[in-house]
Amino acid sequence: MELTPREKDKLLLFTAGLLAERRKARGLKLNYPEAVALISAAVMEGARDGKTVAELMSFGRTILTRFDVMDGIAEMIPDIQVEATFPDGTKLVTVHQPIV
């Protein structure tokens, strides 16, 4: 299977998001890379499902709470930017204050 560098990046992010999702389901508090990966993967999947940029900006803030992450992680992530593929092309989605 031949993958472009962009496709490899998306696959790595999705895999990290799955790992974070499993750890969260087991009750573990997520660290910085896990939190970013989980939110980013969810935004990418939402774009694939046909949600709009505005919907994803709001949705991204509902994925994790301060109780889901280790101490201090929420403050380390002021925003997350994800290049997501929508039915009409690739767009940049910015989620401000993703962990509330």
Curated annotation (Swiss-Prot):
| Main enzyme class | hydrolase
UniProt entry keywords in alphabetical sequence:
Cytoplasm, Hydrolase
Q: What HAMAP family does the database record attribute to this sequence? A: Urease_gamma (MF_00739)
List the pathway annotation: Nitrogen metabolism; urea degradation; CO(2) and NH(3) from urea (urease route): step 1/1
Q: Does Cytoplasm show up as a keyword for this record?
A: yes
Reactions catalysed: urea + 2 H2O + H(+) = hydrogencarbonate + 2 NH4(+)
Task: Kindly provide the name given to this protein in its UniProt entry.
Answer: Urease subunit gamma
Q: Which gene encodes it?
A: ureA
Gene Ontology terms: biological process:
urea catabolic process
According to its UniProt record, what is one Pfam family this protein matches? Urease_gamma
Q: Which superkingdom is the protein from?
A: Bacteria
Decide whether keyword Transferase is in the record: no
Where is this gene product found?
Answer: Cytoplasm
Which family does the similarity line name?
Belongs to the urease gamma subunit family.
Q: Which molecular function GO terms apply here?
A: nickel cation binding; urease activity
EC number(s) stated in the UniProt entry for this protein: 3.5.1.5
Q: How does it assemble?
A: Heterotrimer of UreA (gamma), UreB (beta) and UreC (alpha) subunits. Three heterotrimers associate to form the active enzyme.
GO CC, alphabetical: cytoplasm
Say where the protein is mainly found: cytoplasm
